[in-house]
Amino acid sequence: MTHPRVPIPKRGVDYRGKIVLAPMVRSGECPSRLLALKYGADLVWGPETIDKALIGCTRRLNPITNTVDFTRYSNNGVKHGGGTEGQRESVIYRLHPEIEGTKLIYQIGTSDPETAVQAASMIAPDVAGIDVNAGCPKPFSTTGGMGAALLKTPDKLCAILEALVKEVGNKHEIGISVKIRILDTLEDTEKLVRRLVATGITGLTVHCRTTPMRPRERAIRDQLRMIVNVCHEAGIACLMNGDVTSRDEALQLMQEYGTDGAMIATAAEKNSSCFRSEKDGGLAPWQEIAKEYMRFAMEVENRWGNTKFLLAQIIPGKAPAHQAMAKTRGYFEVAQALELGDELIALAKSVDERLEIGVVKKETKAERKAKNKVAQQTAQEKREQKAAAKTMPRTSRSRSPAAKKRKVDIGELNMPLDVSREMGPGTVTGQASTLAV
């Protein structure tokens, strides 16, 4: 039976036939996505980023990393009138347009149609699609009415999707999709999915676990065929997520359940070559993965804490290199510990210097605080001086009648005319013009 297919926008991507990197908070940053693409991922999802975190950011082209950075300053100094002088600028979202621009899906955390549209509109020109997170069970997401909490407020979820389709998808010619979890009963899940596919989305991903379930619990696929059928009736692509460990397994599950694609999460966190089929080489050794990950991490100057976390997932816990890596404080030290070669070690040293990490002396929190305090005091003094100048009587601000405008012919050197050169300013001769002083 032939099913209808919703049209894919000009700049969007079709999820059908795709094995993709799942959105993961710490494991979906720029170098992880680039590594997944290198080893065969068809599309990559970025980590859930809250709409309010992106709103207020400045889009910057980074000539050093060749990335597009969305950055912002802390609100602390600004709200106390100190401006941004002396503050560190934080990177909220970083993407590599040349490598991943046409394959990157931005996942948004939101609970409001208006802020969702505002944030998504900022990044839409740089990505291939916007995906709404309606499945994250973590408190940082659900307490704000986002993530899996949206499953309990279907009216709000549908309103968000409809607003994004109309105001962002149509205007920027990209697709809008949603990622959900299954509900407790088949009937409840079907009712929800039927509403979602009618909002104008181009794709739906289902994580085959309920909200209370955790990754260690086995995925439930009993409802999957029903969800696939509902999506296909509406012409929507359906992806599955949960306990998918490799490309070959994903293809097998797609055939078994009829899904259009699959997401890989935990397995990709440990070894991104899981996106490569056995016939193309299968899993690469961890040493290769660690080296390639380090290369990407340094090229985009990834935050060191995130890089170290990912290396801890990639390097087996019992390997001597794992313990050596755990003691490192920056890229240079870990490049030496992993024996990555002269080229990468040299790159690591330069990255550490730019990021002020590792063996490079880093400005302490107390030093930054003191610098910010001085900047705030200076700004306050300037404001007070400006205010005082405005209130000063006009006559007192005018020039005194007795004051004379300095002229060249009355300028004099304050020393005897017969002074020797050795006793005067080093480069001034007796015949020099007073203008040269």
Kindly give the residue locations of the regions a language model identified:
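Conserved radical SAM core fold
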Residues: T49-I55, A134-A148, T205-M213
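Short beta-strand segments at enzyme active-site cores
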Residues: G46, I130-A134, H172-I180, G203-H207, ...
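Alpha/beta catalytic cores of nucleotide-metabolism and tRNA/nucleoside-modifying enzymes
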Residues: M1-V25, C30-P31, K38, G81-G83, ...
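Glycine-rich, positively charged N-terminal anion/phosphate-binding segment
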Residues: T2-V13, R26-M122
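Non-cysteine beta-strand/loop elements that form the S-adenosyl-L-methionine
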Residues: G46, G129-K138, A198-R209, A262-E269
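Catalytic beta/alpha-barrel core
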Residues: Q107, N133, K152-P154, T205-R209, ...
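Active-site beta-loop-alpha junctions enriched in small/polar residues
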Residues: M24-R26, T49-D51, G109-S111, G135-P137, ...
